[in-house]
């Protein structure tokens, strides 16, 4: 069923049709209208504005963003999902830029491979979003999902998306979206579907090293993985790896923030002690300096667990309300969340 949904969505995108994209089939989530920018028309833009009512955005690759000179909207992105907005733009030929016709003009110029930065003015009425390299296998967002579906359809990887809002002004949820799809004859695809579809043939990690080591006084199996950016991530497994193991992810920066914060240090030490006691796994994820961990940016760590044959796991976390979208697409399931409270600890 998930793979059939992806195939149907791909065919719809190829034909220039709109689809609805949601996170997971079994979650109460929001949805976006999506279509390939290569097939943009004023009528499609007007449908988004009048029927979906959300913000019309255009999702692009980093290559396209660089070519068009799209600078980040803010220097420090502290939004909940760290959505990669750039400065808004209009095509230079636009007057106000807000009509469906002029927004369509801007969209079509964005997908035109000959367009240059000077062909646009800033700010404007189209909001570009930059998809992460690696797509939904790295970040499970609608930005990445919409670009991925365009790539899978064999069209230019530029997608137009818009959140769907109900007539009463609230966000449309699963049942509302199902009704919307039925009313307008639209296909539905989930981020988790795309992950599962791509995982049939793709893997963004490789294992570089496996060895027996001593980790803070206890024997462990160490696995070193390399991702598509050539960053290395290290996993320590204490005892035999079994299904429903206790797992902790820890983001490793290149600075000394861990030593500068007693709370961060204590929380990590508490996590290590609990993982060792329960023969679990701790994964140290390498990230660029000063890059904050993103809520949806966990695909590489998910692939590491899948590589080791884990399907179900208990998650040790310091963020009780953090959501992990699309896990089912990786063949993973969090059976329990155990929340850490940082504080003094004796090892």
Swiss-Prot record:
Region (GTP cyclohydrolase II-like): 201-347
Residues given in the record as D-ribulose 5-phosphate binding sites: 27-28, 32, 139-143, 163
Residues binding Mg(2+) 1: 28
Pathway given in the UniProt record: Cofactor biosynthesis; riboflavin biosynthesis; 2-hydroxy-3-oxobutyl phosphate from D-ribulose 5-phosphate: step 1/1
Catalytic reaction list: D-ribulose 5-phosphate = (2S)-2-hydroxy-3-oxobutyl phosphate + formate + H(+)
Cofactor: Mg(2+); Mn(2+)
HAMAP family: RibB
Top-level EC class as recorded in UniProt: lyase
A single Gene Ontology CC term: cytosol
Pfam families: DHBP_synthase, GTP_cyclohydro2
Essential for catalytic activity, annotated site positions: 125, 163
Tree of life domain: Bacteria
Protein name in the entry: 3,4-dihydroxy-2-butanone 4-phosphate synthase
């Amino acid at each position: 069923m998930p793979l059939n949904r992806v195939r149907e969505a791909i065919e719809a995108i190829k034909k220039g049709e709109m689809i609805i994209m949601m996170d997971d089939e079994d979650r109460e989530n929001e949805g976006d209208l999506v279509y390939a920018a290569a097939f943009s028309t004023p009528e499609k833009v007007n449908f988004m504005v009048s029927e979906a009512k959300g913000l019309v955005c255009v999702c692009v690759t980093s290559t396209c963003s660089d070519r068009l000179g799209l600078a980040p909207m803010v220097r420090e992105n502290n939004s909940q999902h760290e959505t990669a907005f750039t400065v808004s733009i209009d095509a230079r030929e636009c007057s106000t830029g807000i009509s469906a016709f002029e927004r369509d003009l801007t969209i079509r110029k964005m997908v035109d491979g000959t367009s240059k930065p000077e062909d646009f003015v800033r700010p404007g009425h189209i909001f570009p979003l930059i998809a992460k390299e690696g797509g939904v296998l790295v970040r499970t967002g609608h930005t990445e999902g919409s670009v991925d579906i365009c790539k899978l359809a064999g069209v230019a990887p530029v997608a137009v998306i818009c959140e769907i809002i109900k007539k009463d002004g609230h966000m449309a949820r699963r049942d509302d979206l199902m009704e919307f799809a039925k009313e307008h004859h639209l296909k539905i695809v989930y981020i988790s579907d795309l992950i599962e579809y791509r995982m049939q043939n793709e893997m963004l990690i490789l294992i570089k090293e496996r060895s027996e080591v001593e980790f803070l006084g206890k024997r462990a199996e160490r696995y070193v993985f390399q991702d598509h950016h050539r960053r290395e991530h290290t996993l320590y497994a204490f005892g035999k790896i079994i299904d429903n193991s206790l797992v902790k992810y820890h983001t490793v920066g290149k600075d000394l923030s861990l030593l500068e914060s007693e709370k961060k240090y204590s929380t990590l030490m508490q996590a290590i002690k609990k993982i060792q006691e329960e023969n679990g796994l701790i994964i140290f994820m390498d990230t660029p300096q000063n890059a904050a961990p993103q809520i949806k940016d966990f695909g590489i760590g998910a692939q590491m667990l899948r590589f080791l044959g884990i399907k179900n796991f208990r998650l040790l976390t310091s963020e009780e309300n953090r959501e992990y979208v699309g896990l089912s697409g990786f063949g993973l399931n969090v059976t329990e969340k155990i929340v850490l409270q940082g504080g003094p600890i004796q090892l």
